[in-house]
Amino acid sequence: MYDTSLTLTEFDPELADAILHEEDRQETHVELIASENYASPLVMAIQNSVFTNKYAEGYLGKRYYSGCEYVDVAERLAIERAKVLFDCDYANVQPHAGAQANAAVFLALTNPGDTVMGMNLAQGGHLTHGNPSNFSGRHYKIVPYGLDSETGLIDYDEMERIALETRPKMLIGGFSAYSRHKDWARMRTIADKVGAIFWVDMAHVAGLVAAGEYPNPLPQAHVVTSTTHKTLRGPRGGIILAKGQSEDFYKKLNAAVFPGIQGGPLMHVIAAKAVAFKEALRPEFTVYQRQVVANARAMARIIQQRGYKIVSDGTDNHLLLIDLSAKPYTGKDADAALSDAYITTNKNSVPNDPRSPFVTSGLRIGTPAVTTRGFGVTECEQLAGWLCDVLDGLGAGNEELTVIRDRVREQVVALCHRYPVYQ
C-alpha cells in the first residue's frame, strides 16, 4: 500500500524544487521556441489518471491483455476525433512521439537502402527526414532538396529535377524551420512522376491545418505524420493519418507501430490526445490559430523594420527564421543573450550556414506559446522590439548589452504577469 500522507516536497524535495522552478520559469519567461506550447489543464490532468497503469498491447478489438474495455474507450475517442479533425479515414494514435511515427512510416513503406528524398536539415528539414546522425540517414540513401538561395523558398523545379534523376522510393514533405506554405499538390505530382510514395510530416503545423489556417496535406499525401503538441497543443506524442488508401496500406502502418517499433501504448497519453482533439474541434481553437499566424506576421514585420533579415522574407505560419549570418555574433550568442533577458528562443541553422549546428547563424522563433497565454498583435510587436533591442545590444558590446538585458527582462516579467499561463 502506498503512503499517501507524504507530499512530493516531503518525499523528494530536489525534484519538487525543480518542478517549482520550472513552473516559475514558464510563468515569468516568454516562450518563443516554435515547437513548444502550453498544454491545457485538462490535457495535463488526464495524464495523471489511472490509465497510466494499464498495458494495452495491440489494437481495438485485438488486445494481448484483458481488462482493456475502458482504455479502449479512450483510444476509440482519440481515433474518431482525429479523423474528424483532419478529414481522414485512418488514424493511428499510438506512436509515443513524432519520431516514432516517422520511424513507423519508414518501416511500413520502405526497405533499408531505398532512396528517399527529404528536405535538408540545414535548410529547414528535420532529423528524421534523412540526417546522417539519425536512423533515417544511416539506413537509407538520402537525396536532399532545399531552398532557392535568393528567395529562401523551396525550389520545386529543382526538386523535380532531382527526383527525376534519382527516382526516390519516397518523397518527404514537412519541415522544422520553414515559414511558408508548402505546395502539397506540386509535390504529389512530382512523386507520381517517379512512382514515389508521398509522405508529409506536418508536426509543426498540425494545429493550423486542423483550423484551416494551413493547407491540409490530405488527400495529396499517401500518409501524414505529426506530433500532438506544438501548434496542436496536446500532450507530447505522435499520430499517423491517411485518407483514401487501401486496407492493406493501413495494416502495414499499424503493424509498423505495433509490434514493429513499439510495445504497449501509453494509454494515459492517448486519453490526453482524445481531450486535445476535442479541444481542437471547438470554434475557439480556430480563433487561436488565426491569432498565432497574425502574431508571427506582426513579429516578422517589426524585426524586418529593425533591419534584420528573415529567411523567405516573412511567414505564412507560426514561425520565422532570423538570418544573423552578417552579424558579428552567432545564433548561439543571440540565443544565450535573449535567454538572459527571459526571452526563450533557439539557435537554428540558416540556408548555406557556414557555422556548425551547435553554433549556427540564425534564430528560430514561433508564436504558439505566447498566443496561448493571450498575447495579441500589440504584445507581439512589443516583444519583437525587445528582442531586437537585445540583438542590437549584443552587437554593441557587453556594457550596453547588460543595461538593455536588464531593462528587457523587467519588461518581459511585467508582461508575463499580465498574461499568466496557469496561475
Swiss-Prot record:
Enzyme class: transferase
One annotated Gene Ontology cellular component of this protein: cytosol
GO molecular function, a single term: glycine hydroxymethyltransferase activity
Cell compartment(s), UniProt: Cytoplasm
Disulfide topology: none
Pathway: One-carbon metabolism; tetrahydrofolate interconversion; Amino-acid biosynthesis; glycine biosynthesis; glycine from L-serine: step 1/1
Cofactor dependency: pyridoxal 5'-phosphate
Chain positions of site Plays an important role in substrate specificity: 229
Catalytic activity, EC: 2.1.2.1
Listed Gene3D superfamilies: Aspartate Aminotransferase, domain 1 (3.90.1150.10), Type I PLP-dependent aspartate aminotransferase-like (Major domain) (3.40.640.10)
Keyword line: Amino-acid biosynthesis, Cytoplasm, One-carbon metabolism, Pyridoxal phosphate, Transferase
Reaction catalysis annotation: (6R)-5,10-methylene-5,6,7,8-tetrahydrofolate + glycine + H2O = (6S)-5,6,7,8-tetrahydrofolate + L-serine
Entry annotated with the keyword Cytoplasm: yes
GO BP field: glycine biosynthetic process from serine; tetrahydrofolate interconversion
Sites of N6-(pyridoxal phosphate)lysine modification: 230
Pfam family, one: SHMT
Binding site for (6S)-5,6,7,8-tetrahydrofolate: 121, 125-127, 356-358
Alphabetized CDD domains for the sequence: SHMT
UniProt subunit comment: Homodimer.
NCBIfam families linked to this entry: PRK00011.1
Recorded family membership: Belongs to the SHMT family.
Function: Catalyzes the reversible interconversion of serine and glycine with tetrahydrofolate (THF) serving as the one-carbon carrier. This reaction serves as the major source of one-carbon groups required for the biosynthesis of purines, thymidylate, methionine, and other important biomolecules. Also exhibits THF-independent aldolase activity toward beta-hydroxyamino acids, producing glycine and aldehydes, via a retro-aldol mechanism.
Name listed for the protein in its UniProt record: Serine hydroxymethyltransferase 2
Species: Pectobacterium atrosepticum (strain SCRI 1043 / ATCC BAA-672)
